[in-house]
Each structure stands twice: as C-alpha cells, then as structure tokens.
C-alpha cells in the first residue's frame, strides 16, 4: 500500500544519504526524520490552543510571534494549514518538544541555508512563547551561504539541473584521477585510491576554507589544483615534509 511505498522511499533515501556522508567521512549518532515526531503534534497543537496561544487566521491555525522591538515584519508562525495539514514549522516545533523531553539540552543549534533566518526566528519565538523550552534554553540558528558555480549562480550540472552531492564527489574524483594519472607514474589502482583521498581534501577544504555565512564560488579546476590555497596542495606539502624528515632520519642514522 501507500505506507509500504512511503517506508521504501525513506529506506532508499536514508541509504543514499549514508553512502554520500560515508564518502565524506561524516557520521551521525542519530538519524531522525519528521515522521518520528508525528505522534507529538496533536497533543502539542491542542495545548497551544487550550493555553490561548494558537488561533485561527484565514482558516489556518497560527501563533503570533511579533514583538514591539521588531524593526521588520515577522509574520505569525503557522501551525496548521486551513485543511488541517501540518507544516515544517509544526514538525520542527514537535522536534523541539521531543529533544527537550529526551535530552534536556541547554542549547539547540540549527545549521541551514541562511535564507531560512526568518523561518527559524518564527519557530524559536513560537517555542519560547508557548513554553516548549525553558527560558534559559538557547535556540540558535547558524546560517551558511550557498555554493555557486563560476557564473555566481547556484552550482548546477552541465545540463542545468541541481548538482547532487554524489555527482559532485564523482566529478572531483575523476578530475583528481586525471591529474594524478597525467603527472605521476603509478599503477592504476594506486592512482584511483590516491585520487579519492586527495579529492576528499579538495571538497572539504574548498568548502571549509570559506567564511561559512558567505556565498562562494566552487571552481573544480581551482579546488583540485596542486598549487595555491587548496586541499591537494596542503596534502602535497605534508607528503613533502614527511619525505624530508624520512631522508633526514635515514642519513643521520635515526638519532633524531
């Protein structure tokens, strides 16, 4: 049925995500989705209504979150649509309830696209106003910039579609393999393994070397270069240093 298909889609999606994260040596302690907090939503919404925080506006259920000190408009936080369906706001608020009950954190940090600043301001204000968190609990949104192509626009494929992470990793792996195979004499298998390691440094350093909140240009040619401020150059430098130290120890008899 529909639920079985839905569960299958989730399994395939999570499996694909884990594969991509594994390629970047990234691990998570917990994997939680929106569906994990669906059971919390009805009680949370009912409490907001009973406490007088949630009210109807044009058929939808909302919580007003504007404050007198606001210098710009902050729209109400919508809890349910006019047809009774929940939204991202709803599940994010339910997730806060879940985390507070299970972990009692002093601080919750959300890292997403900086264009979601207003959204999280609404959600955080709603969580505070309705008592989902203690007054001293810190709710923080850290917004990061977008990765753009050479034209300054969001990074896309040659065909103009959205660049998937796995495709980006593959393209960089292929470019690193090409450069290593052209300039160094080594077996094909060794070149492939080396290119994967160096490509990973190109991706990570290329991203992390920029200020997180700023948009930046992801230039595959530049980031895979063995010259300049790049991940491959740093690895090359480390290898050179180790080679020098090894030769020194060999010539000095390993005394130092």
Where are the regions a protein language model picked out?
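Long, well-ordered, tryptophan-enriched scaffold segments
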Residues: 1-13
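Extended, well-ordered alpha-helical scaffold/bundle regions in very large, multi-domain proteins
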Residues: 248-256
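Alpha-helical recognition segments enriched in aromatics with Gly/Pro capping
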Residues: 10-226, 231, 235-248
């Amino acid at each position: 049925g529909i639920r079985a298909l839905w569960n299958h889609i989730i399994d395939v999606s999570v499996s694909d995500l884990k594969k991509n994260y594994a390629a970047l040596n990234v691990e998570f302690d917990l994997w939680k989705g929106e569906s994990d907090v669906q059971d919390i939503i009805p009680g949370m919404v009912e409490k907001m209504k009973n406490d007088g925080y949630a009210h109807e506006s044009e058929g939808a259920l909302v919580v007003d979150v504007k404050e007198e000190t606001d210098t710009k408009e902050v729209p109400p936080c919508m809890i349910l649509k006019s047809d009774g369906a929940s939204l991202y706001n709803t599940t994010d608020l339910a997730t806060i309830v879940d985390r507070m009950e299970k972990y009692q954190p002093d601080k919750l940090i959300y890292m997403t696209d900086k264009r979601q600043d207003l959204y999280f301001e609404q959600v955080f204000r709603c969580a505070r106003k309705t008592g989902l968190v203690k007054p001293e609990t810190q709710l923080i949104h850290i917004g990061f910039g977008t990765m753009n192509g050479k034209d300054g626009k969001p990074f896309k494929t040659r065909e103009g579609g959205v660049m998937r992470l796995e495709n980006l990793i593959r393209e960089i792996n292929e470019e690193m393999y090409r450069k290593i195979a052209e300039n160094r004499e080594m077996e094909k298998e060794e070149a492939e393994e080396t290119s994967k390691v160096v490509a990973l440094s190109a991706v990570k350093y290329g991203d992390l070397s920029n200020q997180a909140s700023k948009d930046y240009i992801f230039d595959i040619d530049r980031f895979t270069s063995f010259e300049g401020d790049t991940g491959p150059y740093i690895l090359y430098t480390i290898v050179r240093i180790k080679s020098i130290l090894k030769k020194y120890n060999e010539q000095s008899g390993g005394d130092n």
